[in-house]
Amino acid sequence: TDNGDGTYTYNVPVREGYTWSDGNPITAHDWQFIWDTVTGLNLVGNWLNAYPYLCEDDEGNAKNCVVSIVATDDYTVSVTFNYDPGLSTWQYGAAQGPALSKAYWESIATDRDSLLAHDAIDAPVSGAFVYDKLEQGAFYTWKYDPNTMWYGGTTTIYDAGGTSVDWDNGKAPAFSGDFGNTTGDSFSYETGPFVGTVEFTLYSDQDAAYLAFQNGEVDFVLNPLGVKRNTFNQLAQVPGIELVQNDPLGMRYFAHNTRLFPGSD
């Protein structure tokens, strides 16, 4: 919605009937709570990717930001920007912003230090796994929640780029829908989980992690950085490992100067 004053608002419905793992309902108030917490306690890091609330730069100049997130009723979230947001800041930004359970976190998030110091091992989640054990510097596990509603369903991917979802497990509110162009050849897969426990082994560096991978001790490595060249070359020598890489120094973004020809045409 164009509010006519330079701001734009998205009114997003929250489907009723979904719950956190502790049984509390997931509502629009959870999104307003996390917005109030992020802005009230000046949380930064990844929170700014989803909820860029800083509307001025270091020199006091105005910049694009989220102005407010409000629960207009129990199942509607209104997100307001001070500009008309594009794909990266709406669809891949605030529209995918996380929420946390207000019922659990409200008494904890009273100040920044208390929030960051809290042991969240028992925090409720919206998923099939709950937090289990954490051994600092060694491992971290998730375990399957037998009472979860977050399981099952069929997802179909089409050659034309579209996706279909059919989810009716008898516990969560049933949902089905088609997104994009659902024509052409397709393949489908069932959503799990198909295991009872997931273990994340913690390693001190890449070398140790990829050595464990080579030895079959772990199934994959979660690595926020690129693979080092010598590690890449070592993996290339291991039978059964297939390597896929992007073109080095390739183009990631392409920009047009719309003020000059041909971009202005």
Spell out what each predicted region is.
Residues 1-5, 124:
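N-terminal lobe/hinge region of extracytoplasmic solute-binding protein
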Residues 11-13, 32, 48-111, 117, ...:
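Surface-exposed binding/hinge segments that line
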Residues 6-46, 59, 65, 88, ...:
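Extracytoplasmic/periplasmic ligand-capture domains
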